[in-house]
């Protein structure tokens, strides 16, 4: 991780009020989540594992690098085994209805795994979560999902996870739009020889091939 970011996180005083402005606000929650994850590891006597599953386009792949970077920073180790992981996040795509059905099917399998691992936290983000119908279905039929957010507030993962840690309630935070771009956060690049460059953020609801309504 960038030494500048690490120095900024270390400078945060958790006894002070939560900063209002980004990225300092997220640095606060990164540091707070580090403490929570460390305490969980000491209690369980093992490292916590996280899986980031990406559906869809290169933009989702780029966003997943950010998600994984945040999770690694707060203490999770990357894993590819969803059933044994302590944190699983689906970065969803909704270009075709079949993509949604795949996600629902995978969630059904995770429900069984969560029964066996009470530490497991399940999160959903990405384009599918910009559909009001999909979010409502998660709320009513998949209540075991812990955190739900969309395409505009990927950078808030640490804050949303902290809220889940401290409230034990389902956290839903969907934005319709934003002018805020927060880039100064940990990232875990999948490849050392290539990287994505964002040309837009969020969802503008006007891709003709997508099922998200205008």
Walk through the language-model features, giving the residues of each.
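Proteins enriched for Cys/Gly/acidic motifs involved in redox and nucleic-acid/cofactor modification
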Residues: 2-214
